[in-house]
């Protein structure tokens, strides 16, 4: 005991000395007038002065501070800057101290934003450090403006990087260049191991240097890192080259930029293990031709971008219309030099001492001999997609320009990212910059000297891809579809409001091809759009047929189907193999969510999907309309007979006022555990007769655990009727009840609470009361909630009921 006592004495002596020194310095600067110790201008307390002195000299005293007793350390923690506060976290936990309140206060004072009410923050330290990293990277915070953020001994980016799980890149790729710079090499290495999600928001057009930095960043974070999810948000006018770069890198393809330093990690990996030819063919899809059209198209873009970046000048939009024959002749004339440009020596992008893998020469030779193989390939060896619409020249480029010289072909190649397939004769004109999915005459485009992606290196790829409000042009949609066909590592795909149009058929074909790949992991698909060329139920049937191993399917179409005009070339309607009438095979769906447009839906089509989904556990129908209550009853009967594993059923924004017998049928189902009727107008007709029948059905159901009734105009009378579900003679095991937005007043809620107390059923779980009229009598509402909290967990809000005036008038 002598040692701890001695240390405690020394620590107290140190505190007194530091405090005395600080007070002496303070007294010299202070006014000579004395102030009361309790006044507003009183000097800081002794312990606070001591803490300030200690925090100012943490570089020397850090180890000693860590050894301080818990009570002393607890007073010093709020005075530390963020770097030492982060470093002392483990020691504080061992002493039974928590820093969460300090980090929360730092968030409120420095970040000055309020987290979303839907967000549950489990660690304020990690949240603060992640946000701090992003602000420093973008230059939106000045670390010198606050002593808690400034310390010359620490790098803000490096110190906070290990807490970053999600990184957002915005606008003109701000931050990408800084992260790949040599001074931040350790920062990038730390991010590669900590970062899981990479997001792009509101991207704008960027220069060549920024895109080259992005290429290196994606290579490090995805190919050599732990990033498993890439999400793109709100990109109204996507830049095709940048979008396809992000896609191809996310899919695992890599071609280093010209003149860039060799990748050290690539060199280490190649020395450790060389990929086999079998592995490469598996990743690229062994069931498809070795030179898949999409891979060739994406490789064309990547190769041409490398050529453009080597010249460090922006792409010039073509202004000449050339014939197919002149295009082929010009490209063939410069084929030898072009191949040399597109295939730089290995030393330009491999680490010194790296041995070439056995598969590398084969891949290179296959690409370099593409011209001769094209001549031998039959015209039917590649699929023949329909011609796609042309794109206009870039603004500001007028007149025709004849390109000559050995470098002219490569400038044209930038715009020949995709070559229109299926044109008739050599004399037809095509505009450079036109996009398509095949080669000339639908054959191999290697006659243009473009390498297949087999010549690119293949690395790890992401497992989750999300595109929110990113309109997909034809070439972008085509590239996505063809990459998807071999993206076996992809587990979840979200396409939300991308304007796919008729490209949905290509998407279905690519998903079908992906499903046939060995090792396909796609288990979740979320698809939503304003319009669809297929009715939503036909689209659902097609997806389920294409992906029988899918577990989660969420599909939503906001407006009725508008089939494309058959008179327009390329829009001749859906292929027969997509909308076939054959029976849907058994699938593995466990969760199905459907959002319907206006108009009655054919119940037999929905029933056919449900019959094939015997493993379905959760079904959600949003805005579904049926021709008659009998059709709705047919759907419910199908659920009872074929979906025995169904546990959760949800209906939202559906008029079920005339389907009361069907609702009672559901409440008597002894397999369902949770039912949701959200804004379904349940009690609009015959409430006096229907409510007792509904309560009786629920009292006899012992398996139902949750009932959600938001937005059904339940009112006080309906709430008091529901209270009978918890009476002594009830066998109900209901433990979650949602009665939000139901015109409930404080007096009705108080009577409901008293009935629960009288029956003494004990705590039954959660009660949600959002957006009810509880502000009309705040005292009564507080008393009701106090009583309810003795019975259940109550979740409510302070809502202005005057917003519900229209709803009130409708119930008068």
Curated annotation (Swiss-Prot):
Protein keywords: Leucine-rich repeat, Phosphoprotein, Repeat, Ubl conjugation pathway
Residue stretches spanning the membrane: none
Keyword Phosphoprotein: yes
Highest taxon of the lineage: Eukaryota
Modification sites for Phosphothreonine: 327
GO CC annotations on file: cytoplasm; nucleus
Sequence segments annotated as region (Disordered): 268-408
GO BP terms: protein ubiquitination
Gene3D superfamilies, A to Z: Ribonuclease Inhibitor
Biological or metabolic pathway of the protein: Protein modification; protein ubiquitination
Bias (Low complexity): 354-381
Modified residues (Phosphoserine): 155, 276, 326, 357, 373
InterPro entries in alphabetical order: Leu_rpt_41 (IPR026137), LRR_dom_sf (IPR032675)
Location of region: Interaction with Elongin BC complex: 45-54
Comp. bias intervals (Basic residues): 387-401
Positions annotated as LRR repeat: 487-507, 518-530, 531-555, 613-635, 636-659, 701-728, 731-752
Assembly, per entry: Part of an E3 ubiquitin-protein ligase complex with Elongin BC (ELOB and ELOC), RBX1 and CUL5. Component of a probable ECS(LRRC41) complex which contains CUL5, RNF7/RBX2, Elongin BC and LRRC41. Interacts with CUL5, RNF7, ELOB and ELOC.
The record's note on its domains: The Elongin BC complex binding domain is also known as BC-box with the consensus [APST]-L-x(3)-C-x(3)-[AILV].
Protein task: Probable substrate recognition component of an ECS (Elongin BC-CUL2/5-SOCS-box protein) E3 ubiquitin ligase complex which mediates the ubiquitination and subsequent proteasomal degradation of target proteins.
Protein name: Leucine-rich repeat-containing protein 41
Organism of this sequence: Pongo abelii
